[in-house]
UniProtKB/Swiss-Prot annotation:
One of its GO terms (cellular component) is periplasmic space. It is found in: Periplasm. NCBIfam families: pseudoazurin (TIGR02375). Binds 1 copper ion per subunit. In R.leguminosarum (biovar viciae) pseudoazurin is dispensable for nitrogen fixation. Disulfide bonds: none annotated. It comes from Rhizobium leguminosarum bv. viciae. This soluble electron transfer copper protein is required for the inactivation of copper-containing nitrite reductase in the presence of oxygen. The lineage of its organism: Bacteria, Pseudomonadati, Pseudomonadota, Alphaproteobacteria, Hyphomicrobiales. This is Putative pseudoazurin.
């Protein structure tokens, strides 16, 4: 009996370990200046799989990451890091997530994370009333979602 129980525990541990190995951790830097200009998340667009995590790294000071109200999938709770805090988020629910740096959103400091294929919540992002610099960056990020991935 103890051998059978031990095999069950070992099998469960192996399955859990394999599942965690499949999930990836992506890194996004929060920068004063990057390849896309001033006040940017780099990369500004990221496509990940459900279950992956993203670590937001305040490479330069005075940055944070926060969900953009109404521009994340339904049922996902909002989150907000403190300034200068490295912050990790696990993305389980498929969809498009618009994130911002609270102090620098007026300068266009936003990021778009696509979780899985066929994000169903693109329309609210496309029509959202946001500052001009935010719209410019969001439109560039939205263009990286290929038409085959867009739900009509």
């Amino acid at each position: 009996m103890p051998l059978k129980f031990g095999l069950i525990v070992a099998t469960a541990a192996l399955i859990a370990s394999a599942a965690s190995l499949m999930a990836a951790d992506h890194q996004v830097q929060m920068l004063n200046k990057g390849t896309d200009g001033a006040m940017v998340f780099e990369p500004g667009f990221l496509k990940i799989a459900p279950g992956d995590t993203v670590t937001f790294i305040p490479t330069d000071k005075s940055h944070n990451v926060e969900t953009f109200k109404g521009l994340i999938p339904d049922g996902v709770p909002d989150f907000k890091s403190k300034p200068n805090e490295q912050y990790q988020v696990k993305f389980d629910i498929p969809g498009a997530y618009v994130l911002k740096c609270t102090p620098h959103v007026g300068m266009g400091m936003v990021a778009l994370i696509q979780v899985g294929d066929n994000p169903a919540n693109l329309e609210p992002i496309k029509i959202a009333k946001v500052p001009n610099m935010v719209r410019k960056r969001l439109d560039a990020d939205l263009a990286q979602i290929t038409p085959a991935q867009i739900t009509q």
